[in-house]
């Protein structure tokens, strides 16, 4: 039988609002998509075809599973947010760690996602500062208003442009038939051979960079937003699982485009990257170039709309989640407008500070992206463990989340050691990981 969903039992007209299924799918897809499947896939494609394997396997076995369960668990617990679920299944200390973690992560997401669209738009017209201010104004509004007012109205349009962009690129790929590096030739780290300045190792770094195409903890903070709007539990699978798979597809498309861009275009990508100064160094540039070259003016505009809409739409729901999490931790009722404002102000102040630092620092975007990627994956580890505990308690087949949980634990801790702030001793890592996994298991 169908258990009544939180959308009906706890309807408050602000966050708990029943909505039609197709709308929820579109919103969930956009929330989780962000620029992950685009920028992440592009940056990840530098590693060569190994990126494909990770996107496909990670998406099916880890990512979609993770999204589905976090959404359903939330529905079973009155639309509880992530820290609350962690508290229920892993205990008090992890919950408090998670509270801080979630909010920090969400603010970082918001910040990264103010910055990247502003770059692209600023490149087209006006300065990026103007755009940053406009995007922020929109965020403040979207974070405050009831969910069906703004988010339910404009998302479906954005979602369409994102999907359109993916389809258009597929068509172009089929017309052009670019020569791609073959899988078995390039399982190593291709970028290293071609571009001496590129130093990341494939093991932890690839899995950190391609977060949203494969698995991402951020999604678990987004699923509850939609779990509060679903009309029936039967819709859980197509919506939570389906939107993740859709996202995996988008990531594959962009990875393919980027492979072509880095390894087979008339002037190889990294030379173009080196030639272009300033704004052009990071992923947004690949996007703008490809869209304008391949899709002409109209297509370019539509595609850029998609690339811009995705981060903006993830940013506002990120701030929205942050607001809800802080509020539930402080037990603040979200009905009165003033309460919503109290929670929002500090959140936005921190974000603006981050932005200022990021803009003044040439490599700022890539640094924040790496931190964001890492905290993202670490978040997914927590969630996977919580789901595993749930399944064990219910005597369900818990291996399906146990394996990804172990794997991601490995990736995250290794990354801590290997990244620039630390030392990269291979043997150390291996046995540290061994100990770590044993302790946990």
Indicate residue ranges for each PLM-predicted region.
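Hydrophobic alpha-helical segments and their helix-loop junctions in multi-pass secondary transporters
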Residues: 110-114, 118-133, 141-143, 163-193, ...
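Selective recognition of specific alpha-helical transmembrane segments in multi-pass small-molecule
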Residues: 102-110, 142, 159-176, 216, ...
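Membrane-interface "cap" regions at the ends of multi-pass membrane proteins
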Residues: 1-38, 235
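Membrane-interface loop-to-helix entry segments
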Residues: 1, 101, 117-121, 128-175, ...
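Loop-to-transmembrane helix boundary motifs in multi-pass membrane proteins
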Residues: 17, 92-99, 103, 129-133, ...
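Extracellular/periplasmic helix-exit of transmembrane alpha-helices
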Residues: 71, 173-186, 241-289, 359-363
């Amino acid at each position: 039988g169908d258990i009544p969903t939180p959308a009906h039992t706890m309807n408050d007209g602000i966050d708990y609002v029943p909505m039609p299924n197709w709308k929820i799918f579109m919103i969930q897809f956009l929330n989780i998509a962000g620029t992950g499947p685009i920028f992440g896939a592009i940056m990840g494609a530098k590693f060569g075809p190994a990126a494909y394997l990770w996107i496909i396997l990670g998406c099916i076995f880890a990512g979609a599973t993770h999204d589905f369960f976090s959404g359903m668990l939330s529905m079973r617990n009155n639309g509880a947010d992530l820290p609350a679920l962690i508290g229920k299944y892993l205990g008090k200390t992890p919950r408090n760690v998670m509270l801080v973690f979630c909010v920090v992560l969400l603010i970082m997401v918001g910040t990264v996602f103010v910055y990247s669209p502003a770059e692209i738009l600023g490149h087209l017209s006006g300065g990026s500062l103007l755009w940053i201010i406009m995007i922020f104004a929109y965020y403040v509004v979207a974070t405050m208003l009831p969910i069906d007012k703004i988010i339910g109205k404009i998302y479906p349009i954005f979602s369409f442009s994102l999907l359109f962009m993916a389809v258009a690129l597929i068509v172009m790929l089929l017309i052009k038939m670019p020569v791609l590096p073959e899988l078995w030739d390039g399982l190593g780290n291709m970028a290293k051979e071609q571009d001496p300045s590129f130093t990341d190792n494939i093991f932890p770094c690839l899995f950190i960079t391609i977060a949203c195409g494969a698995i991402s903890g951020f999604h678990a903070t987004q699923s509850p937003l939609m779990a509060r709007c679903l009309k029936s539990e039967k819709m859980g699978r197509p919506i939570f699982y389906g939107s993740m798979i859709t996202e995996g597809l988008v990531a594959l498309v962009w990875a393919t485009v980027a492979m072509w861009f880095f390894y087979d275009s008339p002037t190889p990508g990294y030379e173009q990257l080196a030639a272009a100064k300033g704004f052009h160094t990071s992923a947004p540039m690949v996007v703008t170039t490809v869209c304008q070259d391949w899709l002409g003016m109209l297509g370019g505009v539509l595609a850029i709309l998609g690339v811009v809409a995705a981060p903006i739409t993830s940013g506002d729901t990120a701030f929205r989640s942050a607001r809800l999490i802080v509020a539930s931790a402080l037990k603040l009722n979200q009905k009165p407008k003033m309460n919503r404002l109290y929670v929002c102000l500090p959140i936005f102040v921190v974000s603006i500070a981050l932005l200022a630092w990021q803009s003044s620092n040439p490599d700022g975007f890539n640094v924040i992206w790496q931190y964001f990627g890492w905290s993202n994956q670490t978040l997914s580890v927590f969630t996977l463990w919580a789901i595993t505990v749930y399944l064990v308690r219910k005597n369900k087949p818990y291996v399906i989340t146990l394996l990804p949980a172990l794997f991601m634990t490995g990736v995250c801790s290794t990354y801590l050691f290997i990244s620039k702030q630390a030392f990269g001793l291979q043997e150390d890592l291996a046995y540290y990981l061994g100990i770590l996994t044993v302790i946990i298991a």
